[in-house]
């Protein structure tokens, strides 16, 4: 298994699909990486040479992925909560942020129903 950005990439899959195992790289970005490194999208990881895997590593290193991306996302959410803006308040209360209704629905965000105390 090739190791890119601290993640073991599956050997049996095509390059584009295998790169999506890295958090922060989807299909579009994986295709862009393959185009930039001149590696065929349909080539399997086990068929690539070490030099090609090194070029993939260098190209992936240009993007914000894995732990750094997770940290940035959590810092952005924390910043919103510290500002006290509407989105920050919604995060703090674990409610939907983007205008969805909450009288009914929103169960995923709100969690399981709580019994009414008498």
From Swiss-Prot:
Q: Which Pfam family is one of this chain's hits? A: Ribosomal_S13
Q: Which gene encodes it?
A: rpsM
What is annotated about its quaternary structure and interactions?
Part of the 30S ribosomal subunit. Forms a loose heterodimer with protein S19. Forms two bridges to the 50S subunit in the 70S ribosome.
Q: Which GO terms describe its cellular component?
A: cytosol; small ribosomal subunit
Q: What does this protein do?
A: Located at the top of the head of the 30S subunit, it contacts several helices of the 16S rRNA. In the 70S ribosome it contacts the 23S rRNA (bridge B1a) and protein L5 of the 50S subunit (bridge B1b), connecting the 2 subunits; these bridges are implicated in subunit movement. Contacts the tRNAs in the A and P-sites.
Q: Which UniProt keywords apply?
A: Ribonucleoprotein, Ribosomal protein, RNA-binding, rRNA-binding, tRNA-binding
Q: What is this protein called?
A: Small ribosomal subunit protein uS13
Gene Ontology terms: biological process? translation
Region Disordered: start-end pairs: 94-118
Family stated for the protein in its record: Belongs to the universal ribosomal protein uS13 family.
GO molecular-function terms, A-Z: rRNA binding; structural constituent of ribosome; tRNA binding
Q: Which HAMAP family match?
A: Ribosomal_uS13 (MF_01315)
């Amino acid at each position: 298994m090739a190791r890119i950005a601290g993640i073991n990439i599956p050997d049996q899959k095509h390059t584009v699909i295998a790169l999506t195992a890295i958090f922060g790289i989807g299909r579009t970005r994986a295709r862009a990486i393959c185009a930039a490194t001149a590696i065929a999208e349909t080539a399997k990881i086990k068929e690539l040479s070490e030099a090609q895997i090194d070029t993939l590593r260098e190209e992936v290193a240009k993007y914000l992925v894995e732990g750094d991306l997770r940290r940035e996302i959590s810092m952005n959410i924390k910043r919103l909560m510290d500002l006290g803006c509407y989105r920050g308040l919604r995060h703090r209360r674990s409610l939907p942020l983007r205008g969805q209704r909450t009288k009914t629905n929103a169960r995923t965000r709100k969690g399981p129903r709580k019994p009414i105390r008498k």
